[in-house]
């Protein structure tokens, strides 16, 4: 089987047990508010209040974007010490996105209603590295997992992507590296592990984590699952045991399916947009009705309860995934009763249709 329970070791944080289901925070698609500072107008995201609440409690991991840090979107105006580093201290690992998600104007039209979004100009590789230098230079550095600057690199040869990422990661040796592979053919939009050579896989051994965005694995669910399986098998054959990170792959149904074929790290803002109820993601607005909060609850109260319950659901799902591996994929009773049979049937199909799961090619 391709699924496993691994451990990654961070230079500052030590050993971290996987899988990790990483709550992400981003200004994209959420409302920007304004405040005045020294006669200038400052934009900050309403998500900062979620981040403040999240940071008040210990957590295994969190993700923020260098784009938002650079523009001060997570600087809360009411706080005497508003810098977001304050909110991140309680997380054992802090994943830093290079800003690729925020630099793309598209918002998933199939998702819940989001605010109109236009990326700000003036953020690129140099600004990203400036954020890294500032965070790495703190008297007490954060336990960072950093990505390569992947925006605009689609179509670059894989060896070029690898060389550029190595140069960046070498300058920040106290950070764990998370190399995001982008489609490497001139017109390619999808990652195709089946086209990677043994040398390509071997060249990835210098990184700590290998990342792919969910969207660049394909539009169809089963195609994405097959590509993750091929990537995991290729890495294993190349003697690379580091985890696969599915960027944007945080979902109560999709995350287990990706985990079953070897991915171990998943992030996303879905936990801020949806409500996780009975093992599935539902419209957040109706959460008060189907939960114990009640139909008379205000939108603010409903949102607060949904966020807190979502974090509990992610923690429970993490434990379930670990138990599933412990039982060698033969039991599904650790998952929510509403979805366990569906996951069982899906995995049986995957085993019969994806040779890599049982060691084939």
What do these predicted regions represent?
Residues 1-176, 351, 355-361:
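Non-catalytic, usually N-terminal nucleic-acid engagement modules in DNA/RNA processing proteins
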Residues 62, 146, 209-210, 266:
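Hydrophobic residues within beta-strands of alpha/beta enzymes
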Residues 176-245, 251-256, 261, 271-292:
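Glycine/Thr-rich beta-alpha phosphate-binding loop at enzyme active sites
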């Amino acid at each position: 089987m391709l699924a496993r329970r691994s451990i990654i070791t961070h230079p500052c944080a030590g050993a971290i047990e996987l899988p990790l289901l990483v709550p992400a925070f981003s200004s994209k698609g959420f409302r920007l508010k304004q405040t005045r500072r020294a006669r200038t107008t400052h934009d900050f995201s309403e998500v900062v209040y979620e981040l403040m609440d999240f940071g008040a409690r210990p957590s295994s991991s969190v993700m923020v974007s260098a784009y938002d840090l650079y523009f001060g979107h997570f600087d809360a105006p009411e706080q005497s010490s508003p810098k977001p580093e304050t909110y991140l201290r309680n997380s054992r690992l802090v994943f830093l996105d290079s800003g690729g998600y925020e630099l793309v104007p598209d918002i998933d039209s199939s998702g819940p209603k989001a605010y109109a979004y236009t990326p700000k100009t003036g953020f690129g590789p140099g600004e990203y590295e400036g954020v890294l230098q500032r965070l790495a230079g703190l008297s007490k550095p954060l336990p960072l997992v950093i990505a390569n600057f992947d925006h605009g690199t689609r179509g670059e040869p894989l060896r070029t992507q690898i060389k550029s990422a190595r140069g960046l990661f070498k300058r920040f040796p106290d950070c764990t590296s998370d190399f995001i592979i982008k489609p490497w053919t001139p017109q390619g939009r999808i990652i195709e592990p089946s086209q990677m050579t043994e040398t390509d896989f071997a060249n990835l051994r210098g990184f700590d984590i290998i990342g792919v965005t969910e969207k660049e694995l394909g539009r169809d669910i089963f195609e994405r699952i097959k590509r993750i399986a091929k990537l995991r098998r290729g890495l294993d054959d190349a003697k690379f045991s580091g985890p696969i990170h599915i960027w944007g792959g945080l979902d109560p149904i999709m995350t287990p399916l990706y985990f079953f074929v070897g991915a171990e790290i998943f992030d996303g803002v879905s936990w801020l947009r949806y409500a996780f109820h009975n093992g599935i993601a539902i419209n957040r607005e109706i959460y008060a009705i189907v939960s114990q909060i009640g139909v008379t609850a205000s939108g603010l109260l409903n949102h607060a309860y949904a966020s807190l319950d979502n974090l509990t659901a992610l923690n429970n799902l993490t434990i379930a995934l670990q138990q599933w591996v412990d039982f060698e994929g033969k039991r599904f009773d650790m998952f929510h009763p509403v979805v366990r049979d569906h996951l069982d049937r899906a995995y049986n199909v995957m085993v019969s249709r994806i040779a890599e799961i049982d060691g084939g090619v």
